[in-house]
Amino acid sequence: VSATASGGRSTGYAQVTATNEGGGTSVLDVTDPTGDDNGPGTYQYPTDSSFVAGSFDLTRFQVLSDGTFAYLRVTLRTLVPTFGALDGAQLLDVYVHVPGATATSTAAAFATRNYAISSSGAWSQRLEVQGFAAPVWVNAGGNTVGTPFVLPVQSDRTITIALPEAQFGTPGSGWGFSVVLTGQDGFSSDQARAFTATPGAFTFGVCASGGTAPICSVNPSTVPKAMDVITPPGVSQATELDPTLGAVVIQPVTVP
């Protein structure tokens, strides 16, 4: 157990962490382009120096299984302590589609995240990880499934979530994962950092100052809170996350 202190614009809590990164058999291994940590192509980082370039840039997503635990692992372009916690900048959600699950949802963690999950990725389990609140592991009804173990590793730029397969199940063919990364803000009702038309010290910008793209005129409170997602083949992140093209729906990556 490691204690995480309060600091900056963040809150603290006692965090249970795994003792190693885990491993086992690779179930799914997907890479994501470097430098697409701009949502639909226009999003900007907050201007405060606490927010380091690459902190919201997913570059890889892995699912592994050792028969006892399943491991969900993201790799980031940058993982550095922010507000006193190694994963203090990030808010990571993974929506898990399990074939045959009877109770599922396509809703985001909060309606104010401003996106939904595709019906093909309708989830029966959701994980949410951040540096300043206990990890969340719930089913589609909002009930706690179990206790996830979380390990951020700066040298590898990874955040690993270890889940007992007795509760999670053994991931395999047909399982889907909708992976969404945005910024954490413990002062926000949905735990996600807010957007403003252009970036503020502690808010993401929908566009840079002087931006002329159609999204630049959209109400910032209605844009999807997603700096980067893991997209399946043939899906453009810039298109998927653009609210001017219709409702924003996140597509899963699926185990063959």
Where are each of the predicted segments found?
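Beta-strand-rich interaction surfaces with strong enrichment in secreted/lumenal proteins
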Residues: 59-62, 146-152
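Surface-exposed, glycine/proline- and aromatic-rich loop segments on solvent-exposed faces
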Residues: 23-130, 184-189, 254-255
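Conserved structural position at the C-terminal beta-strand
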Residues: 3-5
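Interdomain boundary/hinge segments at the C-termini of tandem beta-sandwich modules
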Residues: 16-20
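Short beta-strand and strand-turn-strand segments in soluble, beta-rich domains
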Residues: 136-147
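Extracellular and select intracellular beta-sandwich modules with Ser/Thr-enriched
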Residues: 9-15
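Acidic/polar low-complexity flexible segments
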Residues: 21-29, 98-117, 168-256
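Localized edge beta-strand/strand-to-loop motifs within extracellular or lumenal beta-rich domains
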Residues: 153-169
